[in-house]
Amino acid sequence: MGKSNVIQIRLVSSAETGYFYVTKKNARSATGKMEVRKYDPVARKHVVFREAKIK
């Protein structure tokens, strides 16, 4: 069995509220940084979430 290509990443809010989502992505096919527009409940609006490493 080989090593899994799926890694966990942290999506951090660009509104700098400290809110984040944890999700998975395929490390082999999606090599760039992920940017997703999602809801930030602290800011109470949709903002861009950018990929960051899980500490």
Swiss-Prot record:
UniProt KW Ribosomal protein keyword: yes
Record-linked InterPro entries: Ribosomal_bL33, Ribosomal_bL33_CS, Ribosomal_bL33_sf, Ribosomal_zn-bd
A Pfam match: Ribosomal_L33
Ribonucleoprotein found in the keyword field: yes
Cellular component per GO, a single term: cytosolic large ribosomal subunit
One example of a Gene Ontology biological process annotation: translation
Keywords: Ribonucleoprotein, Ribosomal protein
Molecular function in Gene Ontology: structural constituent of ribosome
Cited PANTHER family: 54S RIBOSOMAL PROTEIN L39, MITOCHONDRIAL (PTHR15238), LARGE RIBOSOMAL SUBUNIT PROTEIN BL33M (PTHR15238:SF1)
Family from the record: Belongs to the bacterial ribosomal protein bL33 family.
Designated name of the protein: Large ribosomal subunit protein bL33
